[in-house]
Amino acid sequence: MITCASCTLAAVLGGLVLSAACGGATQSPTQPAQPGAAAAQARTFDVVIANGRVVDGTGAPWFRADVGITADRIIAIGNLSGARASTRIDATGQVVAPGFIDLLGQSEFNVLVDSRAASKITQGITTEITGEGVSIAPVDDRMMADRKASYDFFKIAQDWRTLDEYFARLAKSSSTVNVGTFVGSGGLRDYVMGKEDRVATADEVAKMKVLVAEAMVHGALGLSSSLQYVPNRFSTTDELVELAKVAAEHGGIYITHQRSEGNRVFESVDEVLTIAERADIPTEIWHLKTAYKANWGKMTEVLRRIEAARARGLRVSANIYPYDRASNGLDACLPVWVREGGTDAMLKRLQEPDTRARAKRDMDDPNAPFENQWYGSGGAAGVMLSSVLDPALRKYEGMTFEAIGKAMGKDPRDAVIDLVIADKAESSVIISIMRESDVVEAMRTPWVSFDTDSGARAEDGPLSASKSHPRAWGTFTRVLGKYVREDGVLTLEEAVRKMTSQAAIRVGITDRGLVRPGMMADLVVFDPATVADVATFEQPNRYSIGMRHVLVNGKSVVANGAITAERPGRPLRGAGYRDSR
């Protein structure tokens, strides 16, 4: 029996690691051989999941078996009908699979507000990967002041400065999910340069490299960027290569919200590939898409370019969410130049009549030299207000800006600007920018995994007040229900592989993502006939259905479809982590 978690993933998957890199599929025996079967029958487990259809995460066909768990690990798989167990879960007619890994969650703050991570665990997510561009740490007093409104609203004390201190806080607070994070290069620019929206000097890049090294030692999974937005949009390719080299030295990866998902998507993908090659680092593209109607159909060429890079040895892959609408901050509907210098500078700038007039003109400019989300979404009819921080503004949630403009008696563009000011840039919107067939084409690609690009929400409590994109509630169950069971886009085994072992490999997690002895006991039990998302754009705040049991580190966080009081989630630190305590 394999007991070394660090060797388990490589030993069990064997060729899968290679095949994932090459875009192939690997089959394992229908019923894996388990040494010591007789001994397993006679022993006592903390939990036995009995009579389930095991989809083990390798992509191999399902097999019927029991799964025995002791403490936080899977100990045995096979016929355990004679074994004793403190808890026995009857999985007859159910699928037993590894817990799902969300390659872009946004819950590093949310789990401190509500430790249930309710909308995530009810869709089977047991691990969240966070840190898009601007990460939770490192921060200084000035950066903390910028985030004060949200922290004060939720009554959360920001008592960390470094990533190590954040992980310590996370471990102390505990939640239902495991959380790993990247160090955001946009946040590093803010830390070193303040609100200076310009190219970094050599000295500033050197300081950022020191911070990357520190974050990697503290447990960051690698380096991230969010190049469509301030301050990361001022990062040059050379700057990113230098920072990524440091992450690579510590065993990390580079992961990016690329510079353009729209009119310059080809050039943007080429930049990602350049960084991967020059820094010699595994690379992942977050929420791959070809946005705005003018770019629909370009997914084929985007995938071809990445596939060609993979064929010549670059370790590049991507993830998506299974929806044709995106979500963003309301301020992202404004021209980029309006947002330069940070939130305070933007809010002050928008008070000026000349600035407002120019911003409104640029919002309707089809040739604007930036990702024009307002125009690309079709303007007022294609942008829906999804959430606000100020309770007085919640009457507008779920309305398009066409409707909001009418309700306010003003130009919808003025409504956007006024709401940005009134809610201090804390509002979010849903934008109609993608085509279903492009999403499906990416989904079918073997090396594409999944993400929610959302923080955890809940039907009650402090995270229930605002609406959000339905992906926060149903990304993974939507894949299983719509795209596996109903549409047949993916087989069940392939979908689970993408959600589990492939995702784990991409971010360097070695002890999760498979149903195998020695692996951590992050497991889901769901009904393949009923599992589904029920969240919609109009009524998003609804938990998924069909997810019967969810275990994290051997503890049940969902039992018989209900959230429990267990909070076994842990910080997940990357390969470069060194414990200095």
Locations of the language-model features?
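Bacterial N-terminal signal peptides
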Residues: 6-21
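Histidine-rich, glycine-flanked metal-binding segment
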Residues: 33-45, 54, 58-99, 114
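Active-site neighborhoods of metal-dependent hydrolases
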Residues: 167-170, 175-202, 206-230, 240, ...
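Bacterial signal peptide processing site
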Residues: 23-25
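Divalent-metal coordination cores built from histidine and acidic residues
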Residues: 91-96, 100-105, 111-221, 310, ...
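Divalent metal-coordination and catalytic microenvironments
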Residues: 52, 67, 72, 93, ...
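C-terminal cap of metal-dependent C-N hydrolases
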Residues: 52, 352, 441-448, 453, ...
